[in-house]
Amino acid sequence: MTDEPIKEILGTPKSPKPVAMEKNANGEVVVTLVPLVSEIQLAAATGGAELSCYRCVIPFAVVVLITGTVVTAVAYSFNSHGSIISILGLVLLSLGLFLLASSALCWKVRQRSKKAKRRESQTTLVVNQRGWFA
């Protein structure tokens, strides 16, 4: 290990660093520090985009779907049923459909949770409003 100073990022909580101990060929114990990444650091690094995965997956899914369609069309235009290129095309096609379906499912689940939160906050407002006029 080097004796360089470790630069701390201001404003982030210090997380405990797990230690991995190993023995090398000479019988010496080597200690390796493995830093943990907290949720705050992850949110800062990604710009808060870690909860919007379904929006990031859609462009990749469309590209994979188009690629799968083209490869499958080329493979079947040469009547190469069961060849490697036709299997690759079908795999890409099904992967694109799977990615689109999973992003749509994630979007639907997120919309439901937003509706539930909105409904819950409206219920709280109505209860508070009844208390004012009672």
Curated annotation (Swiss-Prot):
Predominant subcellular localization, coarse grouping: membrane
Organism domain of life: Eukaryota
One GO term (biological process): arterial endothelial cell differentiation
GO cellular component term of the entry, any: perinuclear region of cytoplasm
The keyword Transmembrane is assigned to this record: yes
Subcellular location: Cell membrane; Membrane; Perikaryon; Cytoplasm, Perinuclear region
Keywords, alphabetical: Cell membrane, Cytoplasm, Developmental protein, Differentiation, Endoplasmic reticulum, Membrane, Phosphoprotein, Transmembrane, Transmembrane helix
Residue ranges of the TM segments: 56-76, 84-104
Statement: the UniProt record of this protein carries the keyword Cytoplasm: yes
Residue numbers of Phosphoserine PTMs: S15, S121
Pfam families listed in its UniProt record: TMEM100
Topology relative to the membrane: Multi-pass membrane protein
Complex formation: Interacts (via C-terminus) with TRPA1 and TRPV1. Interacts with TASOR.
Job of this protein: Plays a role during embryonic arterial endothelium differentiation and vascular morphogenesis through the ACVRL1 receptor-dependent signaling pathway upon stimulation by bone morphogenetic proteins, such as GDF2/BMP9 and BMP10. Involved in the regulation of nociception, acting as a modulator of the interaction between TRPA1 and TRPV1, two molecular sensors and mediators of pain signals in dorsal root ganglia (DRG) neurons.
This protein's name: Transmembrane protein 100
Species whose genome carries this gene: Bos taurus
